[in-house]
Amino acid sequence: METEGRRREVVVSSLQFACSDDISTNVAAAERLVREAHAKGANIILIQELFEGYYFCQAQREDFFKRAKPYKNHPTIARMQKLAKELGVVIPVSFFEEANTAHYNSIAIIDADGTDLGIYRKSHIPDGPGYQEKFYFNPGDTGFKVFQTKFAKIGVAICWDQWFPEAARAMVLQGAEILFYPTAIGSEPQDQGLDSRDHWRRVMQGHAGANVVPLVASNRIGKEIIETEHGPSQITFYGTSFIAGPTGEIVAEADDKSEAVLVAQFDLDMIKSKRQSWGVFRDRRPDLYKVLLTMDGNL
C-alpha cells in the first residue's frame, strides 16, 4: 500500500575519483565534484573514505600519524561546511582524527545549512596486507548512529563496517532511511589476482534488500604506491561505486577507472510504506538473537 498523497523525494549522489598525495588537490577535486552533483540535483552527496590523500594504511609508518588532525576546527570539515551551506546540500566528510592520545577513522556529517551534526568513528578496523588500519586507528567508540538531516535520517558507516550486516541493521533499527558507506578498497598486495569487487557490491546490495532502504557506496580509483621498509606497496583501487535501491537493485554505477558523479532519486515515503508492509521488521525475534552478542556462538 502506497502512502496516500505523499511524496518525500531525495536525490543522493556518490562521488568517485583518484587521489593524489596532496591535500589541497584532493579537497579541490572533492569540491568540484560536489558542485557537479549539486548541478545534477543531488541533496546528499557522499565523498569516498579518507579522500584528503593516499590511502596511507598500506604501510606501518610512524610519520603518517602526522596526517591526523583534531575534529574541532578541522580545516577540511570547515571548508565543506561552507560548501554545504552555499549549495544547500548534505555532505558526510571522512577524515583521520586525532583525539588526545587516540586516533580514529572518522566522518563528520554536515547538514544542508552547514551545521556539523556530529561524527561517527569507524567500528570495525581491518588488519591485513595493504589494509593495516589497526596500526593507525583505535576502534570507534561512538556506536552506530543515525543523523537527522534536512532531507532524510541517514546512517553512515565506513568501509570495513560495510561487510557486517549487524551494522546496517542497527542503523535502520534507529530509523535510518538511507545507508551511506565511504570506502577505500581495491587489489590485494599479497595476491594481485584476487578481485573482491563483486563480493563487495553484493554484500551491500544484501544490506539494502534485507533492510528495504536505499544504499550509497563511494570508492576511489587509481593506483597508489606507498614506500615501506620492505619496499613499495601498491594497491589499484577498483572504484565501481554504486547506488542501490531498497530491493538491493543497482540503480546507478561507475566503472573501475573513471571519475564519476552518480545520482539517483528515491521517494522515501513510498519506500517506508513498502518496508512496513514487507514485514521484515514486524517479524523480527530479538529474543532469539542473543547469540549475536557472543564471539563463538556459545551463550
Curated annotation (Swiss-Prot):
Pathway: Amine and polyamine biosynthesis; putrescine biosynthesis via agmatine pathway; putrescine from N-carbamoylputrescine (amidase route): step 1/1. Optimum temperature is 40 degrees Celsius. The active site is at E49 (proton acceptor), K122 (proton donor), C159 (nucleophile). Coiled coil: none annotated. GO terms for molecular function: N-carbamoylputrescine amidase activity. It comes from the Eukaryota. It catalyses: N-carbamoylputrescine + H2O + 2 H(+) = putrescine + NH4(+) + CO2. Its EC number is 3.5.1.53. It is an enzyme of class 3 (hydrolase). Optimum pH is 8-9. Residues 10-268 form the CN hydrolase domain. Keywords: Hydrolase, Polyamine biosynthesis. One of its GO terms (biological process) is putrescine biosynthetic process from arginine. Involved in polyamine biosynthesis. Catalyzes the hydrolysis of N-carbamoylputrescine to produce putrescine and ammonia. Belongs to the carbon-nitrogen hydrolase superfamily. Homooctamer (isoform 2). This is N-carbamoylputrescine amidase. The lineage of its organism: Eukaryota, Viridiplantae, Streptophyta, Embryophyta, Tracheophyta.
